[in-house]
């Protein structure tokens, strides 16, 4: 599966939105990838996550003990990807604003791969790494369906992307004039 295949799946689900969006990262963009519109279709989700699992197998040497997803956005892709890898899926969730592994225990040194939906700045992956390092897990890699940075983001471990699809994003201070005229919508899940 290549980048165009992934984009075609998003188009098939009407999941590429145009307007003025405040991303989960806090950055602004004229394009939003509404992965919920893809994930509501099990067949499309299965295709993407099967492809992501194949990429993980190609890039990660050795055993994987767990796939870990950051709640909320990483829950569905991490679960479906773990199914294709044949390993358990667990997740981190926010407690007082900080990701924690609350419902699960992992063995010291357990080899884990973090699976996220869409990466822009990599903050959720970095916060997930912190939570896993705190319980002495070995984060061997991270993976995502789409890397919006076009391969530029550094999350601290290898990032395996099913697709790199660079979409320009802006800080509030650097918004183009035409985008600043459009009312902003915040469809992400960071503050939930």
Swiss-Prot record:
InterPro entries reported in the protein's UniProt record: OPRT, Orotate_PRibTrfase_bac, PRibTrfase_dom, PRTase-like
Assigned protein family: Belongs to the purine/pyrimidine phosphoribosyltransferase family. PyrE subfamily.
Species of provenance: Bartonella bacilliformis (strain ATCC 35685 / KC583 / Herrer 020/F12,63)
The gene coding this protein: pyrE
Membrane spanning residue stretches: none
Top-level taxonomy: Bacteria, Pseudomonadati, Pseudomonadota, Alphaproteobacteria, Hyphomicrobiales
Record pathway: Pyrimidine metabolism; UMP biosynthesis via de novo pathway; UMP from orotate: step 1/2
Top EC class, one word: transferase
Entry protein name: Orotate phosphoribosyltransferase
Binding site for orotate: 120, 148
Keywords: Glycosyltransferase, Magnesium, Pyrimidine biosynthesis, Transferase
């Amino acid at each position: 599966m290549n980048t165009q295949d992934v984009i075609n799946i998003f188009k098939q689900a009407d999941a590429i939105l145009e307007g003025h969006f405040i991303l989960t990262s806090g950055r602004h963009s004229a394009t939003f990838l509404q992965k919920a519109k893809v994930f509501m279709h099990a067949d499309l989700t299965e295709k993407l996550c099967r492809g992501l699992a194949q990429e993980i197998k190609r890039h990660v040497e050795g055993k994987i003990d767990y796939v870990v997803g950051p709640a909320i956005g990483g829950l569905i892709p991490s679960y479906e990807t773990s199914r294709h890898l044949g390993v358990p899926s667990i997740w981190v969730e926010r407690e007082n604003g900080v990701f924690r592994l609350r419902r699960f225990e992992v063995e010291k040194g357990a080899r884990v791969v973090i699976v996220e939906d869409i990466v822009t700045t990599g903050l959720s992956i970095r916060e997930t790494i912190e939570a896993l390092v705190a319980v002495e897990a070995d984060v061997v890699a991270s993976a995502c369906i789409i890397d919006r940075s076009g391969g530029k983001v550094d999350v601290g471990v290898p990032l395996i992307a099913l697709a790199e699809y660079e979409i320009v994003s802006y800080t509030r201070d650097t918004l183009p004039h035409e985008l600043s005229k459009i009312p902003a919508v915040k469809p992400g899940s960071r503050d939930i």
